[in-house]
Every structure is written in C-alpha cells, then in structure tokens.
Amino acid sequence: MVTTHNLGFPRIGAHRELKFALEKYWKGESSRAELKAVGAQLRARHWQDQARLDFSPVGDFAFYDQVLDMSFTLGNLPERVRGFHGDALDNAFRVARGRSAHGADDHSACCGGVAAGEMTKWFDTNYHYIVPEFDTNTQFSLDPSRLLEQIKEAHAQGVKAKPVIIGPVTYLWLGKAKDGSDKLTLLPRLLPVYAALLDYFTAQGIDWVQIDEPVLVTELDARWRDAFVPAYDALAARRVRVLLATYFGQLKENLELACQLPVDGLHIDAIHARDEVAQVAAQVPETAVLSVGVINGRNVWKTDLNAALAWLEPLHATLGDRLWIAPSCSLLHSPVDLNSERKLDADIRSWLAFALQKLDELTLLASALNNGRACVEAELLANAKAIESRRASPRVHNAAVKAALARIDASLGQRANAYPARAAKQAAALALPAFPTTTIGSFPQTADIRRARSQFKAGELDYAGYKLAMEREITRAVKEQETLGLDVLVHGEAERNDMVEYFGEQLDGYVFSQFGWVQSYGSRCVKPPILFGDISRPKAMTVEWICYAQAQTAKPMKGMLTGPVTILNWSFVRDDQPRSVSCRQLALAIREEVLDLEKAGVRVIQIDEAALREGLPLRRSQWNEYLQWAVESFRIAANGVQDETQIHTHMCYSEFNDIIASIAEMDADVITIETSRSDMELLDAFDDFHYPNQIGPGVYDIHSPNIPDQAHVVDLMKKAAERIPAERLWVNPDCGLKTRAWEEVIPALKNMVAAARTLRQAV
C-alpha cells in the first residue's frame, strides 16, 4: 500500500486568523492566552483537514517562523534576549520584531530595547526566516516543550503524528556566525541536543520524524557535504525512524550522499527532480522508504493526475509498500482552500488547486495506486477535462503579445547615453542637495484606507467616493513629507493593496483570488496574483495618481512601479512556458507605463526589483541564464526614457555581493537597498567592485517598530561613504513603510532627514 503524508501545512488559516490574532496581541488588545488559543484552534483544524493522510505533520505550526522556533528548541537564543525570564513566545517576538527602548510599555509582548534579528529569504521562496545567530562560544540546550505540547494535542485528536524539524546541517547552514567563526565547528555541540530530541519523540510514541535537509539541493562545498555522514551516524542509534526530506531542487552531486545516509526514508522533490527518482530508487537501501513529492507545493495549478499516475505506477510496481507520496515541499507556500473562492472565473477556477485540493489530489493518487484507476475513474476524467481546457484555452494565448515578443531586439534595452552623461543632465533638472533623502514608496495603510478599499470592492462606495478618499490620503502623505523636509517625494501608494497585486489587477493575463493568501513573514501575508496567460496592458495603471500627487508639490515626485522580475517572482506563474517568456511579456507592459509616466512629466521613476535575487536558482551554476533574462527584462522596462529622466530601482533582503555585476548591468541611475539589519555589511560588495551609479543604502529597518537614532543613521552613512563616494549616496529607509503606523514613521523620518542635514554640513 502506498503511504500518504504531508511535509507541512499553511499556518495562517484560511482567512488569515493567525495574522489578525498576532496583530491584536502586539497592539495589547488581547492576552497571551487568547493568542495561544487561536494557535491551538488552527492546529486542530489543520490536523482535521489532513485526517485523510496516513501521517500528518506536527511542529510545522509557528506563531512567527519555524526557523526561529527551532532556534528556541535548541536553546540558541541571541545574547540580547537571554536575560528575559517571561514567556518564551514573547521572547521569540523580541528576537523577530525587536523593540526600541523608548517604545516599551507594560504589555506582555513589549520587547524593551532589543534589536530585531536578521531576516532573509527561505531558499528561493518568498517566505522569510529569522537567521540563527552563532559565535565561537555558542552552546545549545534542548527545550522540547513546544513540540511535545503539539504532539500531545495531535494525539488527543487521534492524529497519526509525524514531527517536523529542521536538520542539524541545514540549521547551521541557514545561520550566521556574528564573529566570522566557522559554523561547522558547532556541529559536535549540536548533535547531542538533536539526539535527545529524538529520544523525546520516542517516549511520546512517535514512529516517524521528518528531518528537513533542503540544503542537499544546493551546491555544497566538501566540508558541508562531509558533515552529513557523522551527523546522521550520531543520530542513527535513536529508535524513532527518520524520514530525511529534501525539496526545492535536484540532488545532483549530493544524490549518492543522500541515498547512503543512515536514515529510514528519503523524500525528494519529484517536481524539480523527477529525472533523479529512478536513480534514487535504485540506490536507497532496500529497507528504506522513498517519498516522492508529486504534487507541486509551490504553485496553484491542478496536477495532471493521469500523467502522474502513468509515472507513478511503474515506480509503485518496483517499490511496493516502500513508496510514499506527498507534495513536493511544505504547503506553507500555497493558499489554503480553493473552496473559499466565490468570485473566480469558473473556467480558470477549474484549473486550480490550493493546499486542501492538493491533499485531495494526493489521496486520489493513492487510491488509484492502491485500488486501481477504476475506483476513481470519474475523478480522473474530470481532471483530464480541466487539464485540456487550460491547454487549449484562447484566454491563455494572445497572438498580439507573441508578435510583440518576436520584435524585441537589443535596442529596447539601451539608454541613449551612458550614466555619466545622464547624471549631469539629471542633476541639472532635479537640483537635489548632497545626500538627497527619499522613501522607498509606500506609507502606512491606515484603517481609513483599508475601509475605503473594502467598501469600494464590495460596491458600497462608488469610484468617485473612493478616488476622493485616496486623494485625501495622498495629499496627507505629500504634506507630511514636505513638513519633514524630504527631497524626492512619493505619493504613498494608498490606492495599492499590494505592490504586485495592484499591477496584476490591471494587466490582461492575470486573475485574482479573494483568499489566496500565503505567509511572507510573521503576520505579513501576501496574495500573489495568478499569471495564467499572455500578458498585456490595456491602459495606464498609475499615471492618474502620480500626476495628482505631483500637483500637490513643487518637489520631484517619484513614479512608483513594480518591475517585471519581481511581478513574476511574486506571482503564481503559469507552468506551460518558460518563466523568461512571461517575464519579457511583463517587461513590455511595464515599459509602456514608464513611457506614459515620462510623457506626463514625471522625471523620477522607480521600478522596484525587490525579488531579483529571489529568482536565482539554488545552484550557482544555473545563475547566469536567469540573470541574463532578468537583467534584459528590467532594461526593456526601464530604458526607453530620455537622459533627463532618473530611473530608480529598489531591492530588499538582497545579499547581492555575488551578483553585483549583474545589478550594475541593469544600469538604473539610483539603486536603493536593504542594509540596516546587516549593519551595512551588504556594502562589502563595493570593496572589490566599482559600482558606477548612485546608491541609497537603507539606514533603518522598517520591519521593526524601532525608531532610528539620528547619530546611528549618521554613523551608518559614514560607513557607506567609506565604500561609495559621498556625492553618489542617497539617504532612505530600507523598504516601504506600508506596515508601520504614522506615529512610528514621522519620528523615524524626522531623524533620518536630520541625519542627512548633518552629513551635508561635512561635505
């Protein structure tokens, strides 16, 4: 019999219940007990949703981040929070969110002067994790309480529980040695803690534990590869059986290593590594199970079940009961339930599957394998009909878009003159001071903004009323910026629910869900648009709002656009053509908008590419191909303007030392980047690479409620000036201010502007 299991389930709830519970608690509007009760309710519901599986994951739920939870389980707390003796959950929030000392209050979630932990992307996804912190003296001590509590909850509900933990090698690989020490030297200290944790699982009656080692799909150097055998030799004596899980890519040169580790089962991503399955099946021990991830855990398209069965049936004949099937990775990256969607176009809806529907697909495959296709004949027929409907749909294919793609040539990506000539013209046109100040684009999404948008979408407010409400917010944002003394202003993006969804809603080839939310970090959720067909722009998308904002001020107003690479990487993308083709289609659409903004008199245009690095393949050997079409797409979008028009781009969480040459090839006049959480370490890239254009290193972390100190901003900019000539530096936050409150934004920007004025005095 084929065994079914899941690697992880979305934790936010079908209607973002976790998000709202967290934010209510952080505001002091609910108790810790109430927050924990919401968590327990979500876990119970999600286990019930997975009751049809042979094994359900336990420990995949986290109030903020699973890597942060693993740090606490291993007793690896940053030094700055070790003196806190309150509830562990509040301490985790201290690490995740930070807190400025003068922002402290008596609420239990208050964090008292604590810097937020560094946050970065989880492999090549749009999920963020809190980076574990190490140094030479790091010690580990087990705290299994969170996992044991969830196991007891699951057992009380009758769940066949499979605890999920991050493996020791991946955990060290994900972290950062603050003193530059060798992280691998910590492995001997870490392994006894893992062994003790496995013994706790045995004592709880656990049969299988899932240990995630996704680092095995990356290009590891010899030292990291060599760490696996002693690590798993040290854990092999435990009585609980271990399923080693890899996902997000192919094993390649690590395949033989993975197959030889002393574990009881191996999971591989059969979406990205299908060609390796036969080799893995031949190499794993005859006593080991092989779990194949046959349902795509990172996209929203229905699985072609007939094709999947045709591939699985021979494998099942070979492996028999040793075959397990699962999604390719945790369903954390998938929306929860397609059945919540009431407004989706019926045809397009028939092509989709969210997390719960993916589990339906999984159990249907198992039924067909265990009992024969005849028992699910009707379901297979319906699936085949949906697959063919999508393949042949005229809504997917647009001849005019394909013709425009065919006409692309190198000239579309070229500015008239090189940066030095452009910079001189832009300086004359904009007349900005030294260390010019700006923000990244968005300002707080207030309750009034959200209410107006909700009423407009519900038909309770007509467009005239909605437009008036948005113009009121834009006017406020402009006035606040003028009062603060910022140099290049933004309109604040009041009209935008999300930096990708906003554009997708206005592009042909996209469709939108109501409840297709996925977690980005903490309480931050995003609702990626669904790119289902060829992309085109029917009409201007932003010009009206930017022109209104520009009319409110004599200062330069930035046009704000999301770049083609980021729109692509933050969408659920069609899987019937190369991503590069979809990206070029997006580039042509954004190019049209850029030219319309310039025609309307906008002289500073920002094209955000926050997710450029996120799209990098996990293997460096595959980077060049991606970077070539990603940079080309940006240049197509940006480079049709006159020399006097200044093009900005923004990148967040982008450790870009290793792609700095490609970023320079984008040829944006100004790039703004996230550097505050890493204390300007990202600027190390400029020690060895002469970046030719202007740069704005983010001087404070907008993901934390901390208010930046003026002197600290000055110090950060002085560090930046050691690498970048002062005349090419901008002063800005590290990201948009959408998630902050005005009460936090105004003092933060006030200190930032004051710091810039201090810096000008020294020029």
Curated annotation (Swiss-Prot):
Record's InterPro entries?
A: Cbl-indep_Met_Synth_N, Cobalamin-indep_Met_synthase, Met_Synth_C/arc, UROD/MetE-like_sf
Q: What is its EC number?
A: 2.1.1.14
Residues binding L-homocysteine: 440-442, 493, 608
Give the annotated active site. 703 (proton donor)
Residues annotated as binding Zn(2+) are: 650, 652, 674, 735
- Which parts of the sequence bind 5-methyltetrahydropteroyltri-L-glutamate? 16-19, 121, 524-525, 570, 614
The record's comment on cofactor binding reads:
Binds 1 zinc ion per subunit.
Mind telling me which residue stretches traverse the membrane in this protein? Answer: none
Write down what this protein is called: 5-methyltetrahydropteroyltriglutamate--homocysteine methyltransferase
Q: What is the source species? A: Paraburkholderia phymatum (strain DSM 17167 / CIP 108236 / LMG 21445 / STM815) (Burkholderia phymatum)
The organism that produces this protein has a lineage beginning with:
Bacteria, Pseudomonadati, Pseudomonadota, Betaproteobacteria, Burkholderiales
Q: Which gene encodes it?
A: metE
